[in-house]
């Protein structure tokens, strides 16, 4: 039971949380939310919240530049290794030489290696609900939500984050989920085709219905669905490992890595710097597995 697991982790880490019933305390705390009366919720306070991925990436790139990194906004087509190190050749033909390379390219990571990694690339859909200004203000206290669905025919669970202002200046409430019948993409061409579309209309419609049931009376200007790919490893923990003397990999967030990306990156960076594992968790838990 994921709620019991979360409760135990919270107690182990002294997190500030309470267990609330949907038909009692939860409805008083968040009157705009609706769940089945039998539902139980773990409400975390303190540092709980969400990560804005655009701001996170921008902050990481800014700090990297301040520390002397050079950002080259190109895709790598292939890696070649020789006695002098590694050459990364971009899709425009630019060669970049390095003594060591860390591959952290998400769903694309395994295809830069001679031996493919055992990665499962799930094609999923997210839904953005555009909100008028008054509605965004009404929902300003909306928490981040993870909601396990017992009997839904399409979705096993959903997550949602509070309304955010996006680069187009509009405010959106985002919801995504876990499908009961998973759709996988297996090649780079399949991923490209998937990202050129609008996602799965069946999943998008299911997300819309769950959102409107969870937030009765929600005022929405427009809905739009977006494609996404989530990468899973064979053991459902990230691969953070050394492939050979010059190539390392950090890949497979398993749907849970955005909020942990700074620390996962630090683990990988220390591994590259030390030319071996240097962390207080067992290396074998993050070992790569090949297809």
PLM regions and their residue ranges:
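Short, glycine/charged-enriched secondary-structure capping and boundary segments
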Residues: 5-7, 86-87, 115-118, 188-190, ...
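A general structural signal for well-ordered alpha-helical segments in protein cores
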Residues: 3-6, 23-26, 57, 172, ...
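Surface-exposed helix-capping loop/turn segments at secondary-structure junctions
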Residues: 6-9, 13-18, 68-69, 98, ...
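Predominantly flavin-linked oxidoreductase catalytic cores and closely associated redox partners
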Residues: 49-135
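C-terminal catalytic lobe of FAD-dependent flavoproteins
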Residues: 208-291
């Amino acid at each position: 039971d994921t709620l019991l697991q979360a409760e135990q982790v919270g107690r182990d880490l002294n997190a500030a949380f309470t267990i609330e019933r949907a038909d009692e305390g939860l409805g008083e705390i968040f009157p705009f939310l609706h769940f089945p009366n039998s539902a139980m919720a773990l409400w975390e306070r303190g540092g709980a919240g969400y990560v804005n991925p655009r701001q996170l990436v921008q902050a990481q790139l800014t700090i990297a530049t301040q520390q002397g990194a050079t950002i080259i906004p190109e895709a790598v087509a292939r890696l070649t290794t020789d006695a002098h190190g590694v050459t990364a050749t971009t899709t425009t033909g630019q060669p970049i030489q390095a003594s060591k390379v860390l591959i952290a390219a998400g769903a694309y990571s395994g295809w830069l290696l001679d031996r493919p990694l055992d990665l499962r690339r799930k094609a999923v859909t997210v839904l953005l609900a555009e909100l008028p200004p008054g509605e965004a203000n009404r929902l300003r206290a909306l928490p981040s939500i993870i909601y396990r669905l017992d009997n839904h025919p399409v979705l096993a669970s959903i997550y949602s984050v509070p309304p955010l202002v996006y680069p187009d200046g509009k405010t959106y409430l985002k919801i995504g989920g876990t499908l009961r019948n998973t759709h996988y993409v297996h090649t780079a061409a399949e991923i490209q085709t998937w990202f050129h579309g609008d996602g799965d209309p069946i999943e998008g419609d299911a997300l819309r219905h769950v959102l409107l049931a969870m937030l009765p009376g929600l005022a929405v200007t427009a809905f739009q669905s977006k494609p996404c790919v989530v990468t899973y490893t064979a053991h459902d923990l990230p691969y953070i490992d050394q492939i050979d003397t010059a190539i390392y990999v950090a890949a497979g967030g398993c749907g849970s890595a955005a909020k942990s990306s700074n620390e996962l990156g630090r683990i990988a960076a220390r591994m590259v710097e030390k030319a071996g594992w240097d962390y207080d968790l067992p290396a074998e838990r993050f070992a790569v597995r090949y297809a």
